[in-house]
Design a protein with these regions (language model features):
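Conserved, mostly hydrophobic/aromatic
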Residues: 25, 78, 157, 188
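Short proline/glycine-enriched turn/loop motifs at strand-loop junctions of beta-rich domains
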Residues: 26-32
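The feature marks proteins involved in alpha-glucan
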Residues: 1-18, 47-49, 57-62, 69-156, ...
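Catalytic domains of carbohydrate-active enzymes, especially glycoside hydrolases
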Residues: 183-193
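Structural beta-strand segments of beta-rich domains
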Residues: 19-23
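Beta-strand signatures of extracellular beta-sandwich domains
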Residues: 34-36
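Short S/T/G- and acidic-enriched coil/turn segments that sit immediately N-terminal to beta-strands
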Residues: 61-64, 181
Length: 193
């Protein structure tokens, strides 16, 4: 079994190191994070689950770990635990989450968008991040936003779930569509997104 090391909070995403791979994800409101390692993009369950210790693997808003022996091409995802409050934080630990800083994505052949919402597990049909060498990644083809992380807000939503309900404030003919999301822009701006 590979050694589990403390890792570093920066850079975010996955980074190949001399000993293996460092993983780091921002999850400031989480009280627990698991790193899931998969053997293939179609794997219905992870080969390994690494439970990140809050004392060892958390620095401020960042959860991080270095796993010895891993290499480029490794597939991974996260489970994030925390409060589930109506109108507040929506942690759903049954969901495998894609790293927002992943440089590669696999799993499209098994991905089921409808399983991304609700409380049911999506482990067998989730997208997975791919560990890619930073120096091989074409940053010019995928430029970073020109604002600081302190000013960055990542707001994940499902178009249908966000706009389909009758109390969403979206016109019936636009519910469940990208046009419905346009109707919700003032709400998102009020949140600071």
């Amino acid at each position: 079994m590979s050694a589990i090391l403390r890792g570093k909070p920066w850079p975010l995403g996955s980074t190949v190191t001399a000993r293996g791979v460092n993983f780091s994800v921002a999850a400031p409101r989480a009280n627990r994070v698991e790193l899931l390692l998969f053997s293939s993009s179609e794997a219905p369950s992870p080969d390994r689950i690494i439970d990140l210790d809050v004392q060892t693997h958390r620095s401020g808003d960042y959860w991080h770990v270095e796993v010895e022996g891993l290499k480029e091409g490794c597939l991974y995802g996260y489970r994030v635990f925390g409060p589930l409050a109506p109108g507040g934080h929506g942690f759903r630990p049954a969901k495998v989450l894609l790293d927002p800083c992943a440089r590669g994505i696999e799993g499209w052949s098994v991905y089921q968008r409808e399983m991304a919402t609700g409380a049911s597990p999506n482990t067998d049909c989730c997208l997975k991040g791919v560990v890619c060498e930073r120096d091989r990644f074409d940053f010019d083809a995928h430029p970073r936003p020109r604002h600081s992380w302190q000013q960055t807000v990542i707001y994940e939503l499902h178009v249908g779930g966000f706009t389909r309900r009758s109390d969403s404030g979206v016109a019936p003919e636009r519910r469940g569509t990208l046009l419905g999301v346009i109707d919700k822009i003032p709400y998102l701006k009020d949140l600071g997104v």
